């Protein structure tokens, strides 16, 4: 019995990738991934911020994406050119979550988020699943300049603080529910 690995992409590696329509014409470039936190340990991708001609950033819903692979994103070709505006409850992976400090749940210290992996589940939703982090070294500021901590990829459940503190996240989700 063989198992097929779920499709996965890393957000920071996808930035700068061309978005193609079904006939192969390049229509945009990926600039960010928009996610909506579901719980403390999950977030669902709802789309991409893409850049079209004249540096205009627009929203491409994930439902209009037919394929994501290294070097290319293929869409249905339908693109709304209204300027992107972040809504309440949405987070940008590159703009909001990268370089965020997180704490390991096992008490082994803190880390900085370098990249975020999204996996496709059986319902075809893209969910945040793993974080590529750099462990922070204890010590003064000079120690941080000289040596870097180790990098590792961990499950989302292995850290806390990605979406803010519990109080910040609760207030954020409550405000989103009323709008």
Regions found by a protein language model. Name each.
Residues 1-179:
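Peripheral interaction segments used for macromolecular assembly
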């Amino acid at each position: 019995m063989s198992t097929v690995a779920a499709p996965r992409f890393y957000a920071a590696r996808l930035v700068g990738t061309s978005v193609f329509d079904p006939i192969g014409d390049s229509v945009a470039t990926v600039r960010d991934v928009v996610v909506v936190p579901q719980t403390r340990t999950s977030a669902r991708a709802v789309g991409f911020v893409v850049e079209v001609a004249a540096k205009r950033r627009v929203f491409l819903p994930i439902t209009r994406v037919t394929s994501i692979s290294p070097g290319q994103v293929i869409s249905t070709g339908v693109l709304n050119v209204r300027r992107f505006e972040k809504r309440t409850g949405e987070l940008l992976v590159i703009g909001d979550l990268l370089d965020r400090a997180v704490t390991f749940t096992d008490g082994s210290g803190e880390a900085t988020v370098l990249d975020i992996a999204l996996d496709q589940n059986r319902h075809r939703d893209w969910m945040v699943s793993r974080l590529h982090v750099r462990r922070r070294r204890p010590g003064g500021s000079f120690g941080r300049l000289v040596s870097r901590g180790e990098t590792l990829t961990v499950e989302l459940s292995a850290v806390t603080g990605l979406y803010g503190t519990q109080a910040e996240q609760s207030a954020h989700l409550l405000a989103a529910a009323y709008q």
